[in-house]
Amino acid sequence: MTTIAPPAKVNGRWPQLSLLGGAMLVDNTEASLVSSLFPVIRQSLGMSLSALGVLTAASKIVGVFTGPFWVWAARRWSRKGVLVLATGLWGVWGIAAGFSQNFEQLLIFYTILAAGYAAAHPIITEIIGDLFDSSARGRAVGLLYGTIALVGSVLGPIKGQLSNVDDGWRWGLWGVGAFNVLLGLAIWVWFRDPGTGAAERQLADLDVATREAHAKLTWAKAVALVRIPSFAILLVSRLLSGHLLVGTFGVVFLVDVYGFSTAVASVVLLPFGVGYFLGNLVGGFLGDVAERRSPRHGLVAVLQGAQFAFAIVAFLGTQFDYGDIAVFGLFFALMGAAQGVNPGINRPIVMAITPPELRGAAFAIYISIFEAIGWAVFSLGAGFLGDQLGLKTVFLWVLVVLMLVNGAVLSLLYRCYARDVDRVQHELDARRAAALHGQVTDQGIG
């Protein structure tokens, strides 16, 4: 008789994913409101272009500290409780930001707001790994991020129209902040945490206490994550992910470089979001197919190809003046599609090379720390260098050259990814065997 359970399907996983996606959508909408309306905020509060870099960098840097804290708190108390507080009720700070009278006040409130929202990505992504098994994670992640981008893209032009309303950016912050509080209450009422390892074939049919036996998060375990070769390569790649700059400076780029108004430039957010949505769906589907057909190299090949594709499209879409917002919208859609492939690939890769109880910590390191550092450096650099050299030159080096380097770095995954996946599977097999014999083992990941 086999000791391995069939692939698990957690009951109610898609409705739960929808609820978590709603929370991430509102968080992202409020976080992007300042960047998309920065031209009018700049006029309202008398700021320079570099102020956008400072605001974005501060919001990312604070997440370096609070993201891991929220993951620890979720392990110490409850993932649901942390999400209710940090991604829901925390919206009151967005309301406060809407009352800012100068740059300093906006910086303080916006940074506090970001400190709470840093909980969303690592904890929610960890939960996805517990809701879906490896054969469906790509589609789940792709659908989640894609839908968020699609709805966000529809809201993008609407947010842009707030620039035509007196103090429209303030009304935007107030409205989204209030809605975020309501989403927090919805999570409190309807969300059901599946528990650690609920979708792993080796652990799904074990009782909760047995699955949670390894859930304690320690510094030793967290530090051991960076010794996983594939994870270390992904961290370096995240620091080279120049495409992150598009979401922050895309509208400002079109305003400053090609002379469009804020309202007109904001139109590209719709095709960008649609492209990102389709890229997520295609990326998630390709990821699951690649995982089945080539478990050793499939995901890596798709991820690498997405980086090269983005660099080519970014060069064509940012370095030439087409004089028509529709043409720029087309290229932004293609950039969104190439960028959208990433979540449905890199998140499942991280899940595959880390045991269930450490995925939250892994995503805190990957997203809250390394992605935040990269985003902060890009935003600060683009803000200050944009004032000196112009955003067109900055976009060439960050969106094109750096992304080509990123794709080359990912080639290193071909040597170690399969080995790291096998290591995790052997550990889970050992845990199941020990559980069936009434024992608990913790062989670790190093």
Language-model features and meaning:
Residues 109-148:
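Cytoplasmic helix-loop-helix junction between adjacent transmembrane helices
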Residues 81-95, 297-315:
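Structural signature of the two symmetry-related core transmembrane helices
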Residues 34-35, 228-281, 343:
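Extracytoplasmic gate region of multi-pass secondary transporters
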Residues 144-195:
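Helix-loop-helix hairpin linking two adjacent transmembrane segments in secondary transporters
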Residues 65-103:
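Conserved MFS/SLC helix-loop-helix module at the cytosolic interface between two early adjacent transmembrane helices
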Residues 2-10, 195-233, 431-437:
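Juxtamembrane intracellular "pre-TM" segments in multi-pass secondary transporters
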Residues 32, 60-68, 118, 153, ...:
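Residue-level signature of mid-helix packing/kink "hotspots" within the transmembrane helices
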Residues 171-189, 393-412:
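Symmetry-related core transmembrane helices of the 12-TM Major Facilitator Superfamily/SLC fold
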